UniProtKB/Swiss-Prot annotation:
Description of its domains: The C-terminus regulates the targeting to host mitochondria.
Gene responsible for this protein: ORF3a
Compartments in which it is found: Host cell junction, Host plasmodesma; Host Golgi apparatus; Host chloroplast envelope; Host mitochondrion outer membrane
Subunit-structure text: Homodimer. Heterodimer with movement protein P17.
Membrane-crossing segments per the record: 9-29
One Gene Ontology term, aspect cellular component: host cell mitochondrial outer membrane
Record function comment: Together with movement protein P17, plays an essential role in virus long distance movement.
Superkingdom as given in the UniProt entry: Viruses
Name used for this protein in its record: Movement protein P3a
């Protein structure tokens, strides 16, 4: 077992988690704002 490779993989994986969470959060914000605009359109009509 190559511990350096394993440690590097764990470090890369743990450092990639915040980026993926931030990406999901931005996607969620875009979708929710889009849905809100659609709901507002129907609410006015």
């Amino acid at each position: 077992m190559d511990y350096k490779f394993l440690a590097g993989f764990a470090l890369g994986f743990s450092s990639a988690i915040p980026f993926s969470v931030a990406g999901l959060y931005f996607v969620y914000l875009k979708i929710s704002s889009h849905v809100r605009s659609i709901v507002n359109e129907y609410g006015r009509g």
